Amino acid sequence: MFPMVTEFINYGQQTVRAARYIGQGFMITLSHANRLPVTIQYPYEKLITSERFRGRIHFEFDKCIACEVCVRVCPIDLPVVDWKLETDIRKKRLLNYSIDFGICIFCGNCVEYCPTNCLSMTEEYELSTYDRHELNYNQIALGRLPMSIIDDYTIRTILNLPEIKT
């Protein structure tokens, strides 16, 4: 008779434990139910990127001294720097500079180690094209500043995202 009572007690304890676990999961689900949605309607709404966002690289041709530091620090040797040595002044003259954003991993090493600060990261992240060869930007394309999301009147920017309470 006692084994039957202990089995009944164990069964009751297991039932209470299972109900508690189910209740904990249900409480977590309910705590997520009252949060605001995180999804945005992308083409019409855009998030304003943070100050340290690593987007498309901007290049200033006049500042570059063709030292090729950007090529040396790049993990994939990506920037293509063509230069010519001017014998009369014994300095390098930059002829062409290009970066293929189809290969770039946006690590930011080239921007960080550039001695003349001719490279900078922009907030532009919409680089998709139908042809991957269009992602190879030369110094003219790299020199264009992107249109700021804030200045575009057709897009509603989302400044303050709801904070996630933990």
Curated annotation (Swiss-Prot):
Superkingdom of origin organism: Eukaryota
Catalytic activity line of the entry: a plastoquinone + NADH + (n+1) H(+)(in) = a plastoquinol + NAD(+) + n H(+)(out); a plastoquinone + NADPH + (n+1) H(+)(in) = a plastoquinol + NADP(+) + n H(+)(out)
UniProt EC number: 7.1.1.-
Residues reported to bind [4Fe-4S] cluster 1: 64, 67, 70, 114
Coiled coil: none
UniProt keyword Phosphoprotein present: no
Pfam families to which the protein is assigned, alphabetical: Fer4
Domain 4Fe-4S ferredoxin-type residues, every copy: 55-84, 95-124
General function of this protein: NDH shuttles electrons from NAD(P)H:plastoquinone, via FMN and iron-sulfur (Fe-S) centers, to quinones in the photosynthetic chain and possibly in a chloroplast respiratory chain. The immediate electron acceptor for the enzyme in this species is believed to be plastoquinone. Couples the redox reaction to proton translocation, and thus conserves the redox energy in a proton gradient.
The protein's name: NAD(P)H-quinone oxidoreductase subunit I, chloroplastic
Source organism of this protein record: Laphamia lindheimeri
Lineage: Eukaryota, Viridiplantae, Streptophyta, Embryophyta, Tracheophyta
Annotated gene: ndhI
